[in-house]
Amino acid sequence: MSALYGTEIPFVNSAFDIAVTTKTDPRSLRADARRNRERVLAAAREQFAEHGLDVHMEQIARAAGVGVGTVYRHFPAKEDLLKALADERFARFADKARAALGDPDAWNGFCGLMRESARVTAEDRALSEAMNQLPDLCTASAEKVRLIELSRELIERAQASGAMRADFSADDVPSLMRGLARATAPHDTGPPAMSWERYLEIMLAGLRPPRPGTLPGGRS
């Protein structure tokens, strides 16, 4: 079993321990089961951010204050848990994008979404790396689709206002954010990593419309 999944532990301990996968709508769970699921997600988010993807399910259970069987009933494998956290992140960003559409300044609304995305990515690099390395975590996410649609609307709005260069598209955003994450990741050798705030502002400046000027090589 790889480090991603940690130690394999049977999760069916009794007749009651029937797996409830992440395909189950959390809203259909009993109130106590829903609370336990939320506690597991909160603990997993904290443990992954602090210790990376090598965290075992038993550690998450201890941090959540529940039995390991409870963790496995909701998330039979670590990948299921990561999928739920990724979907939760997409939902958070989509809500931010929806709010940004209400900003009368289209450019300011777009920048607000990008800053929030960069901040969350920097604070929880383990989940960010998992989402980049394991594309299957994100392929079936309805929240990801919603985020993409809202991001496209934000970009078109900023372009229509003249605040953003016309050749930028929503398809460029994931690559830019991955580049930002890699450039600002802490490392053991070489020069210190640039802060994500500084790198992001440089990137945003590059999305402004190009200024008119004389091309190199022209006559004076």
Q: Would you name each region that the model predicts?
A:
Residues 1-63, 80-83:
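Basic, helix-initiating cap at the start of DNA-binding domains
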Residues 1-24, 148-160, 186-220:
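C-terminal peripheral helix-coil segments that are non-catalytic and often amphipathic
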Residues 34-42, 49, 53-54, 74-95, ...:
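An amphipathic alpha-helix adjacent to DNA-recognition modules
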Residues 39, 59, 108-116, 146, ...:
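Amphipathic alpha-helical interaction segments
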Residues 65-75:
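Short hydrophobic/aromatic patch on the recognition helix
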Residues 84, 91, 95-123, 136-139, ...:
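Hydrophobic alpha-helical connector segments
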Residues 129-138, 217-219:
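Short linear capping/connector segments at secondary-structure termini
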Residues 135-186, 194, 198:
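Amphipathic alpha-helical packing segments from all-alpha helical-bundle domains
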